[in-house]
Every structure is written in C-alpha cells, then in structure tokens.
Amino acid sequence: MNNAGNFFAGFFEELSPEQVRDQIETLLFGPMNVTRAVLPVMRKQRSGLVVTISSTAGITGQLFCTAYATAKFGIEGWMESLTPEIAPFGIRTMLVEPGFFRTELLTTDSTTYAQPTIDDYAKQTKEIVAAWKSMDGKQGGDPGKLANALVQLIALKEPPARFAAGADAVQVFEAKAEKLLARARAYDELSTSLAYEDA
C-alpha cells in the first residue's frame, strides 16, 4: 500500500521551487518507486493489488494546495494509466481518495506553510493557516474506520478501482462529475466542430 504523506501548504507564488519538488518527490515519486519494486514479484505470481492513497485534492484543485494537488493529480493520472498496463498479468489497482481524516497531516511535523512574502496574499494566508490549525485533531474522518473499510474492499474478488473515502469525499466526487459534464455541454457545439471536413 502506497501511503506517503506530507504537505507543503501555501499560495503557488510563495512556495519555493524546492518545496514543490519535495512535495512531488514524496507524494508521487515515492509511491512510483515502491510500486516499481513490487511489480516484478506480482507479475511473476500473476496476481496482486496495488493500493495507493491519493486525496480529494487529486480530484479537484483547492485553494492553498497547489503543490499538494499537483502531486495528487499526478498520482491519479499515473494509476489510471498503470492499470491497463498491468491488468493482463492479473494485477489490479485501487485508488483511495480520502477527505479530511483525523491523521497527523495537519500537524507541524507533517505540514510546512510557505513563508508569507507577498502582501496581496497576506490576509488570506493568515485566515487559512488559522483555520487549518484549528481543524487539526478535529477532522471528521475516523482513520480506524477507514482501515476497516479498506480491509473489506481488499478482500473483494473485484476491488473498486476508486474509493471515495468519507462523506466529504463523496461530495467532492459528485461535484466534480457535475462540473465536468456541465463544462463539456456548455461548449459542445464548438468542441465537436473542430475536425477536418473530410474526417
């Protein structure tokens, strides 16, 4: 199970390139490296399940989460593309997108806030940091219940390719699906008029 976690929080302009790279290194390249190491064993035995913990931040972008969402969106694309590559060998994948769970993610050990350097962001930064710090230890999701749910899902003959973990995650999934459909329909005529005439 891939479950690396840290959080560089802040507005994009105030996050350093090094912080963004570190975020991607941990959240994306870390799981990639672990998976690359275990796939030969799974291919040899012609079975396996690669479980990767993503986030609702991999489904929809969020304020103050540019580095984190970049890495999580990367995980989503990587796993979606990896799935058909390894399916012929009996290997399945499962993405887990949790909402807010009462983990250590928002503690000072796991979250690094960007240094405020731009006045235009100062007020909002102060408000967001205060809100998130007050949320630490009060998140609604129970990690123990999530662990039990994952045990149930992993035991299934056909585990789901995606699992929205938490009521807030279900809401994020539904809102994103509705938004994508609305955007596709809004410019449907223009979108479908872009082919060559002889195509």
Language model feature labels by segment:
Residues 55:
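Residue(s) in the substrate-gating loop at a strand-loop-helix junction
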Residues 35, 71:
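Active-site helix of classical SDR
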Residues 60, 81-92:
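Active-site-adjacent segment of SDR/Rossmann-fold oxidoreductases
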Residues 11-12, 19-21:
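Substrate-binding pocket helix/loop in short-chain dehydrogenase/reductase
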Residues 88-160:
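SDR active-site lid
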Residues 3-8:
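Conserved NAD(P)H cofactor-binding loop of Rossmann-fold oxidoreductase domains
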Residues 13, 60-67:
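Active-site loop immediately N-terminal to the catalytic Tyr-X3-Lys motif
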